[in-house]
Structure formats: C-alpha cells, structure tokens
A protein has these predicted regions:
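Conserved N-terminal/central alpha/beta ligand/cofactor-binding core
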Residues: 3-4, 27, 33-34, 39-176
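A short, basic/flexible loop-to-alpha-helix module at the beginning of a structural domain
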Residues: 1-9
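N-terminal Rossmann-like FAD-binding beta1-loop-alpha1 element of flavoenzymes
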Residues: 12-37
Length: 181
C-alpha cells in the first residue's frame, strides 16, 4: 500500500475549528497570511458547541464588573488549572472577543436599556456576577459563527475530518513541515 504525499505551502497552520481556532485563522487571514485550518470534525461541529450557547462577557450584567474580578472568578472556578496570564488575558479581552463573534453572525438578545448583550438573570459557573450571555440556538449559534469566520475569508483553506500528527522543525533552514492525515 502506498501513501500519496501532497506538499502544500502556508504561512499559518491552525489546528482546531472551534472558537479559538476559527478566530485565530480569521485574524491571520485578516493580516494577509495564507492559512490552512485542520479540523478533526466537520466545520461548525467543533467542541465549542458543547458550550450550550453560553458565553462569559465582562460587563454584560453590570457596569462595575472589573477585569480583576472576572479573572479571579475564573481562577477560583478552575481550581488549580488556570494560569494567571491566561485568565487575565481572557478577562481583558472577553468583550472584544465576543464582539468578534457577533461580527461573524452570533446574535444574542440585547438589553435595550444598556444597548449590550443581555446577560442571564443569575450568576452561573462559579461567577459572583451575572455575566453569562445565552443564545437562542445554543451551541449551534457558536458553530455557525465559527463556520462563518472560516468560510468567508479568502485566504483560509481547510481540511475536515483530518488529524494533525506532527510538526517537524528544521531550525537551520526555517523550513518547517507538518504531517497531517
């Protein structure tokens, strides 16, 4: 049995088509990079859909929801897993990241009085404030927004039902190779 090898050239390879992967691929393409996205699942069916359509968005429930408070909530809810730099970064950019999702079609209910996404009435997931935003189509809404972020960009190619097995680094020539099945 012989295996056919196809050599391709990309500026950026993104592994995963969920929230982080789709948005990373979109950001790289926005900067002019030729992007390959590798997904183990069909596009729109990533593990991000497991979120059941909930997103943590700072200040969605109140104006005095500070970055430090959200970061601390995430650390406490995650036990010993969270890394301070990551929880701080998430807290700082949660509104901006959520707005990026909205640019790609995510449609929350809007609090008309405050002109922002409507948070759920109760604090969820270990949070001390109500900053969880729900969506009518639950996780499918996020899957669709991820799909939109990948498909509508001109420089994003993608492989579905594929596995990223290895990255071979050539430190002398900076000619790196990825093995994808």
């Amino acid at each position: 049995m012989s295996i056919k090898t196809e050599w391709l050239s990309y500026d950026v390879i993104v592994v995963g088509s969920g929230g982080a992967g789709a948005q990373a691929a979109s950001a790289a393409a926005d900067q002019g990079a030729k992007v390959l996205l590798v997904s183990k699942d069909p596009l729109g069916a990533s593990d991000t859909k497991i979120s059941e359509g909930l997103a943590t968005v700072r200040e969605s429930g109140s104006d005095d929801d500070m970055e430090e408070v959200l970061s601390e909530n995430i650390k406490l809810a995650g036990g010993d897993l969270p890394i301070k730099n990551l929880t701080d970064t998430f807290s700082k950019y949660s509104k901006e990241a959520y707005d990026k999702y909205r640019e790609h079609g995510l449609r929350p209910s809007i609090n008309k009085e405050k002109n922002r996404p409507q948070s759920l009435p109760l604090a969820m997931g270990g949070h001390n404030r109500n900053r969880s935003v729900g969506h009518a189509n639950h996780g499918v809404a996020f899957g669709h927004a991820n799909w939109d972020a990948i498909i509508k960009e001109n420089n994003i190619d993608y492989l579905e039902d594929a596995w990223f097995l290895d990255l071979i680094v050539d430190r002398k020539n900076e000619n790196n190779k990825a093995i994808i099945v």
